[in-house]
Design a protein with these regions (language model features):
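Flexible "arm" and connector segments at domain edges
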Residues: 1-175
């Protein structure tokens, strides 16, 4: 199995997110940027890299992917709100597929982690339209696979639609 992303896959994800976002009347770029950073930290927390007292740190794979899928949702939403074009999709796909990401996103390296955590807010607010989307897809490619992340995202979006329909998480105030 290759760990590649296609333009068709990315365009499908962008459309799924656009369809979902159309259900959110209060959608706005600033809140989406904040949510993106929050979701990064929620995903990062599932790695438990700092829990050196545990024999096997890290939440189960499905929990990790669920949180990263949330980050992907906001990355897609940010791209859509910033009017991503097909040329940007090609740029994201080319970057994801071209780079090997060797030794990238090593959150077990304390110095790297400190630098990354300091810069995450700058990355999400960068003027380059593809940065938030590229970042989450690259993390997905390094720590899991593109297909695992896409599958987790689609599963999460089904649940998010159910929340908006009032058929899931009724007691959590989604509708």
């Amino acid at each position: 199995m290759t760990n590649h992303l296609t333009v068709d896959q990315l365009e499908e994800l962008l459309q799924i997110q656009k369809d979902f976002d159309s259900r959110i009347p209060t959608l706005n770029l600033q809140d989406s940027r904040i949510a993106y950073v929050v979701e990064f930290f929620e995903w990062f927390n599932t790695l438990e890299t700092f829990k050196n007292w545990k024999k096997k740190p890290g939440k189960p794979l499905d929990v990790q992917l669920d949180e990263l899928a949330d980050m992907l949702a906001f990355g897609l939403s940010i791209a859509n709100q910033r009017n991503i074009e097909e040329k940007h999709s090609h740029e994201v796909v080319d970057k994801i597929n071209a780079l090997k990401y060797e030794n990238a996103f090593d959150f077990y390296d304390k110095d790297y982690t400190k630098t990354f955590l300091t810069e995450i807010n700058n990355l999400v607010n960068e003027k380059k339209i593809i940065t938030p989307l590229h970042l989450v897809l690259a993390i997905g490619k390094v720590h899991y696979s593109i297909n695992q992340l896409i599958d987790a995202y689609k599963k999460k979006m089904e649940h998010n639609h159910a929340r908006q329909d009032g058929t899931a998480d009724k007691d959590k105030g989604y509708v």
